[in-house]
Amino acid sequence: MLSPTNSTSKTAPVPPQDSSKPVLISEEPQNQLLQKVARTALVVLLVVVTLGLILLFYSFSDLQSFPWCCQTRPSTKEQPTISIPVPLPSPPLAVPRPSTPPPPVISRPSMPPAPTPAISPPSTPSAPKPSTPPPLPPKAPKPVKTQEDLLPFVPEQVFVEMYEDMARRRTIEALVPAWDSDIIFKCLCYFHTLYQGLIPLETFPPATIFNFKQKIISILEDKKAVLRGEPIKGSLPICCSEENYRRHLHGTTLLPVFMWYHPTPKTLSDTMQTMKQLAIKGSVGASHWLLVIVDIQARRLVYFDSLYNYVMSPEDMEKDLQSFAQQLDQVYPAYDSQKFSVKIAAKEVIQKGSGSSCGAWCCQFLHWYLRDPFTDALNDLPVDSVERHENLASFVQACEAAVQDLPELFWPEAKALF
């Protein structure tokens, strides 16, 4: 069988390739690779250098913020700071420096001294000389507020008036001494010798605001018993016999009831206890004498308070006495059915500038009433308190002289019954 190819057209045989020989690379691709590597390395280097410069700049800025960064001292030992105060009276001060150049002179300012900032001398290679800083100027003392600064301002005229009032009070106290129950009872005994219709009621113990009504009613009941010839039911006085007391009750037409008052106690027992305590101490304290006159003949209740409203207001006292007057109308009725009336004697404070003349004022008012019960002698009192008490002092001296011969705590003899 014949081959399809022509036998005459023969091709040259291809020699076999040797597998051991290396395949050669062209030089152009190799140069391009080297250029890429070089460019990459250059870019990386530029980036590193840029970052390094940035870090170096920020590091230098941080170092510059420290206080020791810009100082040129070679030594690590910190130089002491010298503060030089510049007071007014002192001469100009020179700041000493360890260096050879002369120190600059700090001239004194024309304005008042102010706190001087600390001056740091420049450092030198040599060791600085130790120096002691001068003492700081004393601080201005803080204003101290005294008790006078805290008190309100009082005008001088007020002190003058207070001094005059104090001097006036001392003068009045020297003119009129305090009267106790013994002097008052002696004064009543003396008044009985002048006016037979007055009964000298004992003032030991005296009546109080809590029992004066019961005492008045008891005396009027005993008077009715004497007029009827019956025995008395009330208690007898300490220093008076029953016969003498009955004679006094028979002829009396006026009952002077002295009341002892103190604002602290609120009951009768507490009042008597306070009275004993003050008597032991020998002090009057805040006690006060009051007077209630029971005028049987004129059918009238007269209330006198030299302090005007020490116990209660005059309006309240008048209402209370009006109620008591109605009770007396039933206890001791009049033959002509006349009713008891009430009168508040004092219209103002009588004992101005005095705290212990109340007993003497009660006796003075009683003496005025005995002389003329229908004339108000209080309207004629002097306005000046010193002059008023000078007149009272004259009455006191006359009474004290009159009672010197009277026996102690002894009732005067009343007239015999008819």
Swiss-Prot record:
Transmembrane spans: 40-60
GO molecular function, one term: cysteine-type deubiquitinase activity
Keywords, in A-Z order: Hydrolase, Membrane, Protease, Secreted, Thiol protease, Transmembrane, Transmembrane helix, Ubl conjugation pathway, Virulence
Localization in the cell: Secreted; Host cell; Membrane
Membrane topology, record value: Single-pass membrane protein
Entries under InterPro entries matching the protein: Papain-like_cys_pep_sf, Peptidase_C48_C
Full protein name: Deubiquitinase and deneddylase Dub1
Organism, scientific name: Chlamydia trachomatis serovar E (strain Sweden2)
Gene name tied to this protein: cdu1
